């Protein structure tokens, strides 16, 4: 009989030949702007720790205190033995920050997207999704069983055409978009999307994963940045990027959150977020709101790097309005080579390749804790490669 697992080796060979193969690299020590990777100290431009809070002593102290009081795990589903007062405090803090009625915390942002989408739509419904949306939005759409149609990246006119042609054929319609697109750094046209959602009686779900803590006057995200606070929509985000912890959230109306508590499978049938992660996220939200200097320093770094990168000839810098700056390369092999050369020079900014993105690139993420000297070294190395 043939080996039923033999195809795995052939698939891996195909991945290798396409220069799509991926493997993990262990970071040693605490998260920060400078880390040790494979025994080499490198400047870290690969992290989503935008405010530099993952190594903040206050988050660590909050996590330790919660572990000492409540133990290491939540021990069960939130609907059974896994709910702690800390979870409720975190949900209230998120809802207050976002100026919504209620919030629900999941064990990850990925689970928040999959669970919310699966609960909101089904076989009789339509999903319209930006083609560059995160994998969690795309997979959530597929798993929901709804009819899924993509529209070209940020093309509101094309989305409207699809709504005109198809909306009347379905019970419900859910529009899905990232607010900050994680592999490009650009922003969705949120006010226009909200206008279309209202015009065609659609739900709008916006993933604020890379905007939470970063965008808007108080760091509440792109909804705040665009002046759309208070308008009817579904906001999803993560606690694992600018907030330096782990977990995801959904925030919106009381009815929405109450419904998800009863219908979102990835919340109902999984263990609640650990006390340590919950307490760390709660501490991070307080810091993000009370200490705007972290966000101000982040944006100072973003603007400084963008200004310097624009002076490098032939660097194909992609449009961005966030701490994510990318420059495009011709092929996966070139991206891998540039990423390797950067690492040899003490810069950690790995290659991003298909199928994650349509075109290969180097993705640079800024942090509030980057120093001017870090940014200047990155630019000097890129100039040398160019």
UniProtKB/Swiss-Prot annotation:
Belongs to the class-II pyridoxal-phosphate-dependent aminotransferase family. BioF subfamily. Signal peptide: none annotated. One of its GO terms (molecular function) is 8-amino-7-oxononanoate synthase activity. Its EC number is 2.3.1.47. The modification N6-(pyridoxal phosphate)lysine is found at residue 241. Substrate binds at residues 22, 134, 356. Keywords: Biotin biosynthesis, Pyridoxal phosphate, Transferase. InterPro entries: Aminotrans_II_pyridoxalP_BS, Aminotransferase_I/II_large, AON_synthase_class-II, AONS_Archaea/Proteobacteria, PyrdxlP-dep_Trfase, PyrdxlP-dep_Trfase_major, PyrdxlP-dep_Trfase_small. This is Putative 8-amino-7-oxononanoate synthase. It is an enzyme of class 2 (transferase). Catalyzes the decarboxylative condensation of pimeloyl-[acyl-carrier protein] and L-alanine to produce 8-amino-7-oxononanoate (AON), [acyl-carrier protein], and carbon dioxide. It catalyses: 6-carboxyhexanoyl-[ACP] + L-alanine + H(+) = (8S)-8-amino-7-oxononanoate + holo-[ACP] + CO2. Its cofactor is pyridoxal 5'-phosphate. The keyword Transferase applies. Homodimer. Pyridoxal 5'-phosphate binds at residues 109-110, 182, 207-210, 238-241. SUPFAM superfamilies: PLP-dependent transferases. GO terms for biological process: biotin biosynthetic process. Pathway: Cofactor biosynthesis; biotin biosynthesis. The keyword Transferase applies. PROSITE patterns: AA_TRANSFER_CLASS_2.
């Amino acid at each position: 009989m043939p080996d039923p697992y033999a195809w795995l080796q052939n698939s891996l060979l195909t991945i290798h030949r396409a220069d799509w193969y991926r493997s993990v690299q262990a970071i040693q020590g605490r998260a920060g702007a400078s880390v040790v990777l494979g025994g080499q100290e490198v400047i870290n431009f690969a992290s989503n720790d935008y405010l530099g809070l993952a190594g903040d002593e206050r988050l660590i102290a909050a996590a330790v205190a919660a572990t000492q009081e409540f133990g290491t795990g939540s021990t069960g589903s939130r609907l059974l033995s896994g709910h702690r007062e800390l979870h409720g405090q975190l949900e209230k803090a998120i809802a207050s920050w976002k100026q919504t009625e209620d919030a629900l915390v999941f064990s990850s942002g990925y689970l928040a997207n999959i669970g919310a989408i699966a609960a909101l739509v089904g076989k009789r419904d339509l999903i319209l999704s930006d083609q560059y949306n995160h994998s969690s939005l795309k997979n959530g759409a597929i798993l929901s069983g709804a009819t899924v149609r993509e529209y070209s990246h940020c093309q509101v006119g094309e989305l409207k055409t699809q709504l005109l042609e198809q909306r009347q054929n379905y019970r419900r319609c859910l529009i899905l978009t990232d607010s900050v697109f994680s592999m490009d750094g650009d922003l969705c046209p949120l006010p226009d999307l909200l206008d279309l959602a209202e015009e065609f009686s659609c739900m709008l779900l916006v993933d604020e994963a890379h905007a939470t803590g970063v965008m808007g006057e108080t760091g509440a995200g792109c909804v705040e940045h665009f002046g759309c606070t208070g308008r009817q929509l579904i906001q999803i985000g993560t606690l694992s990027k600018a907030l330096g912890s782990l977990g995801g959230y959904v925030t919106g109306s009381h009815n929405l959150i109450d419904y998800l508590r009863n219908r979102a499978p990835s919340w109902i049938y999984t263990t609640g977020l650990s006390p340590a992660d919950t307490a760390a996220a709660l501490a991070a939200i307080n810091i993000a709101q009370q200490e705007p200097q972290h966000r101000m320093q982040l944006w100072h770094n973003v603007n400084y790097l963008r200004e310097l990168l624009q002076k490098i000839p032939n660097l194909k810098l992609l449009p961005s309005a966030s701490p994510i700056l990318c420059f495009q390369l011709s092929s996966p092999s070139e991206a891998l080579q540039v990423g390797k050369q950067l690492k040899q020079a003490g810069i950690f900014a790995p290659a991003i390749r298909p199928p994650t993105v349509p075109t290969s690139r180097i993705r640079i993420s800024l942090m509030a804790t980057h120093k001017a000297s870090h940014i200047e070294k990155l630019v000097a190395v890129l100039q040398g490669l160019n």
